[in-house]
Amino acid sequence: MRSTKVIHIVGCHAEGEVGDVIVGGVAPPPGETVWEQSRFIANDETLRNFVLNEPRGGVFRHVNLLVPPKDPRAQMGFIIMEPADTPPMSGSNSICVSTVLLDSGIIAMQEPVTHMVLEAPGGIIEVEAECRNGKAERISVRNVPSFADRLDAPLDVTGLGTIMVDTAYGGDSFVIVDAAQIGMKIEPGQARELAEIGVKITKAANEQLGFRHPERDWRHISFCQITEPVTREGDVLTGVNTVAIRPAKLDRSPTGTGCSARMAVLHAKGQMKAGERFIGKSVLGTEFHCRLDKVLELGGKPAISPIISGRAWVTGTSQLMLDPSDPFPHGYRLSDTWPRDE
């Protein structure tokens, strides 16, 4: 088979959300930091288009690129590529990356527990993997510092009127709204409507509320997180949530960065304190087990250090190739499966 490039990929999903991992065939992008490298990937778009667009990818797919770490504390770095964004951090993708690193032997597995330090674009993350019989069975990640930004802010959304929302950062930026406010329930049969309304809310939040990270060059709201009320049993809170990802799809997992942002909001509202746990449930019913580990400051703002825990499974291996006569070297997107990102 002739090809001008060959990219080696290990397929993976974390609690339902695809997070494939490039393990070979791509040189590290330019940049002095992993953050700068991720900005190159985002602005250049060549790799993003090749692996995410049809016919090699699809709107459902996230892909992670392994890179040598820049921080001496880390064993590996990774850059996350989502359908419309190249984010600072992702819970489900970090769980996929950790699982692939251990299950494939790229990093030596130690049973029953392997400790790793990885470098995401958003910063260093500590990983604890519960391992048995050559399989990383559960991954726990200390996420980057997370914080609430705006609480109970009014937001005008076409077709919905004025709704009350929170905004927060949990490794990525979110506008958070209760499902009852928009007349929805979080269930598979409403996935299309949830995704479309969520993207509309995200657009309105960027126009009316905005967001600015105190330390990173991250100046927009990426996602809408739609939630149902939390319940409490002792020191454990449980809540269903789903995240609308541009151009308009739902995260199949409970969204680790979303759970972190939600815990930051719960803490800011006095509804959760350090040491308490949160179980986030996805639209599929899968779970991330989270903990508000400690309270800290980030750039003068109150913040939390969250830990997120979930499972991932390798789904296969593949090689992406490009024949020199292929008319679609950058792929393509059609609005039947790639919703219009307006």
Curated annotation (Swiss-Prot):
NCBIfam families xref list: T3LHypDht
Superkingdom assignment: Bacteria
UniProt protein name: Trans-3-hydroxy-L-proline dehydratase
Function, in words: Catalyzes the dehydration of trans-3-hydroxy-L-proline (t3LHyp) to Delta(1)-pyrroline-2-carboxylate (Pyr2C). Displays neither proline racemase activity nor 4-hydroxyproline 2-epimerase activity.
Catalytic activity: trans-3-hydroxy-L-proline = 1-pyrroline-2-carboxylate + H2O
InterPro entries from the UniProt entry: Pro_racemase_fam
Chain positions recorded as substrate binding sites: G91, S92, D251, G256, T257
UniProt EC number: 4.2.1.77
Location of the active site: S90
Alphabetized SUPFAM superfamilies for the sequence: Diaminopimelate epimerase-like (SSF54506)
Keywords from the named record: Lyase
Keyword Lyase in annotation: yes
MF-aspect GO terms: 4-hydroxyproline epimerase activity; trans-L-3-hydroxyproline dehydratase activity
Similarity annotation: Belongs to the proline racemase family.
Organism the protein comes from: Brucella suis biovar 1 (strain 1330)
Enzyme class: lyase
Disulfide bonds: none
Keyword Lyase part of the UniProt annotation: yes
